[in-house]
Amino acid sequence: MFARTILGAAAAAIAFASAPALAQQKLDFILNWVPGGDHAPYYYAKKLGWYAKEGIDLNIEPGKGSALATQKVGAGANPIGLADMAGVLVAKGKGADTVAVFNVYANSPQGMYWLKSSGIKGVKDFVGKKIGNPAADGARVMWPALAKANGIDPKSVTWVNIDANAKLAALKAKSIDVTTSFYNIHHVFQRELGDDMGFLAWRDAGLNPYGNSIIVNAKFLEGNRATIDKFVKVTQRAFAACVKEPEPCVQALVDANGALKFDNEFTNWKLVEVLMSDKFSREMALGIHEDGRMKADYELVKEYIGLDKPFDVKAVYTNEFLDRSIKMPK
């Protein structure tokens, strides 16, 4: 009898020790794209149990473009997601009720790629050409701004729907003339196209709005502020840890996504660090949406793309959940 009591107590102790410290709230987090180096901090924090320790059961869903992520979060299909901020502003004007809570790309990651042998030298040469990318790609939403900023008609190009993984093949086969991609996989285009690679960073062409930010469905945020506060603080800490020591961070990403290669994603991550750093992320807080920049981005979208309905830009973002002591290194 005594032995059974001891065994029962031991089993109960083991069960208690292995139970989560907090009841776990599931969060379905949709990415802007398939997992890559830029998503490493989420996988790192999840692997180390940082989210679970705060009562968050984080489910990371691969995405198919910022536009889709914005739509799903705006509609409440996903409570939280990752999307390009310019597209988020456009969607807000159409009624999508989302709030940005953490900025990842302080600099625009958008880039245009082509073959130099095609004769294209810059944006003005895109007129009459075919640009290929997925239908829900954030670059399509922002294209009118880039075109108008460079003095060409946004409708002067033809958009071709292709899968993300087919961009390079389509470019090489010359079934498209130009494609779009984020700067953090610039090294892949360099490797595949070599000296024939033509490239233009949007941030060097008069267009540098905030890039990817974490957005939350407004109604979900209203009822789950404590959860989002914990999520943001863990995520901010994870990004800072990955900047300081990227190797284990990238390894966590690769461990969770078997098809990825460490060397490729490590290079990807180092380019992400470039995109994360601006005056405000270095001096105010990593992840901040600075008021002046957000106002300028709103005016840019309003002028070049148009908003179905004007709104107060401060309604689409908040910095309240950030730890102001965590900054990008100077």
Segments from the language model and where they lie:
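Short, glycine-/small- and polar/acidic-enriched structural segments
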Residues: Q24-A173, D177-N184, L200, N208
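N-terminal secretory/targeting leader peptides
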Residues: M85, D195, A201, D255-G258
